[in-house]
Amino acid sequence: AVEVLRGVNMTVYPGKVTALVGDNGAGKTTLIKCLAGIYGLDGGAILWEGKEVNIPNPKAASALGIEFVYQDLALANNLDIVQNMFLGRERMSGPFLNEEAMEDLARETLAGLNVTTIKSIRQQVSSLSGGQRQSVAVAKAVMWNSKLVVLDEPTAALGVAQTAQVLALVRRLADRGLGVIIISH
């Protein structure tokens, strides 16, 4: 049998940014996919807030307060910012979408992260810059009372100014008391 991860021990603290750095093929993505509930563990344990937890699927990770911003951002270009932030988690008012509540929470979340470069929350995601798209993806992750946000290569395809903007956003997440993991090479 092939061992992919062995002897891994990582601690992430609230209010701190932890870097997960390694060469291609080192196991960074595999480790994070275990934390996301995409891959199961053959051995070892995941401790969450001091207790051993089983994370059998991504929904279980979200229920614990673990959210992910993947390198491709997982945003739908044909939808606007609000639609992307609530995709799969839409707010309802009876049988109808509660657009007003979703707009309010999206606006509040972006403002809370000090995202000021977006003109309208009803703007199509396809019209956003790389830094703005990254900000929307991060806001989507923190909107659900997350405790830990994992960012996979958050500045990979960004220019200098956009990189500075995203790193400032990451710092604000930690300042709000969230644990943050940044995956990088």
Regions found by a protein language model. Give the residues of each.
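Glycine-rich phosphate-binding loops of nucleotide-dependent enzymes
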Residues: 1-185
